[in-house]
Amino acid sequence: TQFLRYQERIMSKAKEKKVGVIFGKFYPVHTGHINMIYEAFSKVDELHVIVCSDTERDLKLFYDSKMKRMPTVQDRLRWMQQIFKYQKNQIFIHHLVEDGIPSYPNGWQSWSEAVKTLFHEKHFEPSIVFSSELRFRSFVSRS
């Protein structure tokens, strides 16, 4: 019976775990992004950072920038993994491909389905969404 009570306590704590998620292009990642991620991480037990890519949008961002070389999705994922390597068991980096999804608000339904699929594939369900963009705030109430 003592073991069962212990197991119930562990299960109860697991249910209480705060899981956060942040979406961004991180094109390129900068100190504002890093500070936002650490601020979000300070409020949760586990944080999932979603690096969003869209081939056409990313190309336009590159042409409109002063970057000498276009960062690939792999570059952006590697930057994030490198920056948060000491928190790799608490801050998880994922990739969301947004190719073919119309921009907000027209692609809202397709985008939210892609996000839900990613959550399912990566086996997590966020209890809080952190974002500087208003469009993501409504995702919480619709999901």
What kind of region is each of these model predictions?
Residues 3-143:
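Nucleotidyltransferase catalytic core that binds NTPs
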